């Protein structure tokens, strides 16, 4: 009888780009010694669409529908960063009511993003029940978005100097009811998940990132705050009207997957606090700064020109970007979402550089999974929270 010889050489495994735990078209080339991970190389670019180059050939208003395809689970933040840059370059003041509406929409979008992180993350480590629970609350958030913007996703709601429309009648009461209901939902998650011994075995002490390590790798968002760094751009940069609300930065010291989970759960509760304060104190007034139209380029329509022939045609907005450069950033659900913008006195940006949080946070993955077990790759990758639309751009 021939006994097969035991092979001791390393095994290379491809995870993705169609693996259900890759959260998009991410491919990992994993080198294994049995169940132990020796090396891991992420392969990116499967969802690259040239978003930066497209921006340089569009006006800001024309480009707004494109930006919702970066992080398509938190589209309000990509819209906010797109209009914040021109507003700062042109020194445009946003009406107070518009600022409050923006904050409400941003925090609702943060909750929706964290919910759709929580469900697949739990499914990755073997807990199927929360996956169905989170869709129950997420549908309520999308109902609010649909009532206010007309779209469940890809809202196209932000405008330079304000928002596209005011809140409809009865929307504020509906949103307050959601806040009260959602607090009970989070309590249910904590009972079901946080003290579950099987869950704790899978996440506690897995994927530890130290404080210095997190700073050196340029991590941001929950990845940074779970490592003991109290850094939140809503407190640091004082954008929109976050300074007018009472809320706390959520952070943990341990730096493992459990700490990142606790930070995101805490952030959802803080978002509810911000939304409730904004809804109760929302001021009256306009929802858009009409003075932004003074930045439109004057047209001298020639005879037989397209815009001359069609008298009833509404002229397309051509907001001129001053000849300056600017870096603007917001605290997105996954971290620091930034744009480096250079204007050259034309309707198109001369340079539009995107700093996606998922792309930066993903770089530490090979370091975290080394010397871990194969099953821990899903736990660590899920705790990072990436969306390939913004990673590949």
UniProtKB/Swiss-Prot annotation:
A single cellular component GO annotation: chloroplast thylakoid membrane
Any single Pfam family the record assigns to this protein: Complex1_49kDa
Keyword Plastid: yes
Protein name according to UniProt: NAD(P)H-quinone oxidoreductase subunit H, chloroplastic
Keywords assigned: Chloroplast, Membrane, NAD, NADP, Plastid, Plastoquinone, Quinone, Thylakoid, Translocase, Transport
Source organism (scientific name): Manihot esculenta (Cassava)
EC number(s) on file: 7.1.1.-
Lineage per the UniProt record: Eukaryota, Viridiplantae, Streptophyta, Embryophyta, Tracheophyta
SUPFAM superfamilies for this protein: HydB/Nqo4-like
Protein family: Belongs to the complex I 49 kDa subunit family.
């Amino acid at each position: 009888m021939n006994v097969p010889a035991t092979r001791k050489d390393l095994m290379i495994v491809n995870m993705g780009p169609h693996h259900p735990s890759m959260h998009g078209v991410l491919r990992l080339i994993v080198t294994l010694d049995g169940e132990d991970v020796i090396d891991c190389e992420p392969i990116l670019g499967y969802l690259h669409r040239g978003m930066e180059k497209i921006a340089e050939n569009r006006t800001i208003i024309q480009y707004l529908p494109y930006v919702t395809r970066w992080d398509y689970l938190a589209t309000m933040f990509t819209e906010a960063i797109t209009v914040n840059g021109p507003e700062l370059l042109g020194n445009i003041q946003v009406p107070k009511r518009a600022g409050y509406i923006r904050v409400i929409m941003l925090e609702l979008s943060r909750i929706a993003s964290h919910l759709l992180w929580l469900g697949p993350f739990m499914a990755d480590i073997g807990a199927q029940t929360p996956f169905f629970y989170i869709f129950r609350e997420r549908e309520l958030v999308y109902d609010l978005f649909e009532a206010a913007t007309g779209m469940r996703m890809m809202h196209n709601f932000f405008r330079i100097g304000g928002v596209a429309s005011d809140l409809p009648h009865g929307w504020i009461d509906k949103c307050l009811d959601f806040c009260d209901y959602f607090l009970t939902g989070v309590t249910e998650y904590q009972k079901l998940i946080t003290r579950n011994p099987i869950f704790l075995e899978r996440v506690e002490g897995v994927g530890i990132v130290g404080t210095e390590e997190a700073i050196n790798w340029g991590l941001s968002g929950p990845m940074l705050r779970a490592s003991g760094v109290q850094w939140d751009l809503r407190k640091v940069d004082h954008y929109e009207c976050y300074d007018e609300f009472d809320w706390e930065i959520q952070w943990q010291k341990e730096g493992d997957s459990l700490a990142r989970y606790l930070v995101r759960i805490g952030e959802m509760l803080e978002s509810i606090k911000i939304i409730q304060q904004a809804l109760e104190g929302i001021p009256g007034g306009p929802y858009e700064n009409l003075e932004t139209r003074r930045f439109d380029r004057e047209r001298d329509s020639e005879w037989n020109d397209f815009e001359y022939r069609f008298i009833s045609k509404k002229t397309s907005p051509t907001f001129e970007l001053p000849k300056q450069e600017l870096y603007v950033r917001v605290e997105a659900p996954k971290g620091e979402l930034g744009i480096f913008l250079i204007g050259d006195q034309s309707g198109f940006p001369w340079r539009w550089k995107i700093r996606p949080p998922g792309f930066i946070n993903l770089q530490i993955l090979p370091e975290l999974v080394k010397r871990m077990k194969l099953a821990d790759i899903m736990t660590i990758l899920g705790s990072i929270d990436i969306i390939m639309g913004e990673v590949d751009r």
